[in-house]
């Protein structure tokens, strides 16, 4: 009889344990929105260990975890069909999420994506040596910087995807991004330093002084003033919204005329360099 009761008790304990780790639903949890369009379910009550249960589904993969807080912060983990491990870390103040994928050993990082509340994000992919091989930085306004073929020294290919067109260039080992547009003898270079500071330069290989173009960059107004034979012809403004506008000077090169017009195609940008 004692063995029978002991067996019943063990079965009930297993059932209780199973219920404790079962998926959360709208009845026993609260839904919390996270940066990156993700949602986490937080249990309304603490478990037997005094912690709140967390449940989230990312890319059709169910992740589970626990937290001392009931606001949605904490760490959730899961495993993909290929045995690779997934980890989602939610900041205490819900200001950012970090989504990581590891190899089967749970230590070797395959990829990492950090997303902030303003919808900006940084995503990295890693090679066998654990070095960054690809990187994508998405700004809050949706424009982004894409880095590929990153070598051990940090250099690689670069691409800036703006609202309507794309600029291409290189990433230097010191973290400087250089994006170039060429039109005839003129080369426009947009440089983005590791700190985020932007500078723009114009070089012209034309040897005829009367038609040779020069550029003067004003960092305060983010404006490149283009001149021909020392006479101003137009302004290119690189706005905080990551757009480019063009406005011409009068024939004397002293006053701007008309209104600044947003450049929406690469063809229009090249035309502004003529």
From Swiss-Prot:
Keywords: Cell outer membrane, Lipoprotein, Membrane, Palmitate, Plasmid, Signal
The keyword Acetylation appears for this protein: no
Residues linked to a lipid group, S-diacylglycerol cysteine type: 17
SUPFAM superfamilies (alphabetical): Outer surface protein
Membrane topology annotation: Lipid-anchor
Record-level GO cellular component terms: cell outer membrane; cell surface
Lipid attachment in record (N-palmitoyl cysteine): 17
Listed result of changing residue 271 to D: In strain: Goe 2, G25, PWudll and TN
InterPro entries cross-referenced by the UniProt entry: OM_lipoprot_Borrelia, OM_lipoprot_dom_sf
PROSITE patterns per record: PROKAR_LIPOPROTEIN
Signal sequence bounds: 1-16
Pfam families per UniProt: Lipoprotein_1 (PF00820)
Compartmental location: Cell outer membrane; Cell surface
Family according to the record: Belongs to the OspA lipoprotein family.
Miscellaneous section: The sequence shown is that of strain B29.
Name of the protein this chain belongs to: Outer surface protein A
Origin species: Borreliella burgdorferi
């Amino acid at each position: 009889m004692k063995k029978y009761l002991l067996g019943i008790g063990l079965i009930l304990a297993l059932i209780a344990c199973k219920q404790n780790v079962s998926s959360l639903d709208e009845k026993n949890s609260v839904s919390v929105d996270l940066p990156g369009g993700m949602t986490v379910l937080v249990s309304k009550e603490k478990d037997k260990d005094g912690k709140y249960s967390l449940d989230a589904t990312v890319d059709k993969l169910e992740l589970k975890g626990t937290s001392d807080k009931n606001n949605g912060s904490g760490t959730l983990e899961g495993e993909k069909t290929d045995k690779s491990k997934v980890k989602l870390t939610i900041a205490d103040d819900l200001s950012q999420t970090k989504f990581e994928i590891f190899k089967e050993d749970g230590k070797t990082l395959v990829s990492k994506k950090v997303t902030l509340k303003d919808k900006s994000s940084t995503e990295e992919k890693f090679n066998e040596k654990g070095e960054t091989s690809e990187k994508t930085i998405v700004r809050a306004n949706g424009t982004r910087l894409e880095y590929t073929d990153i070598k051990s020294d940090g250099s690689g290919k670069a691409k800036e995807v703006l609202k309507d067109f794309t600029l291409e260039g290189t990433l230097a080992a010191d973290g400087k991004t250089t994006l170039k547009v060429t039109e005839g003898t003129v080369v426009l270079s947009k440089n983005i330093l590791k700190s985020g500071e932007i500078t723009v330069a114009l070089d012209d290989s034309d040897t005829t002084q009367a038609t040779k173009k020069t550029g003067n960059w004003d960092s305060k107004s983010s404006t490149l003033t283009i001149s021909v034979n020392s006479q101003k012809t137009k302004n290119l403004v690189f706005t905080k919204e990551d757009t480019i506008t063009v406005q011409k000077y009068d024939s004397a090169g002293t006053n701007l005329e008309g209104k600044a017009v947003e450049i929406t195609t690469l063809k229009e940008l090249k035309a502004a360099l003529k």
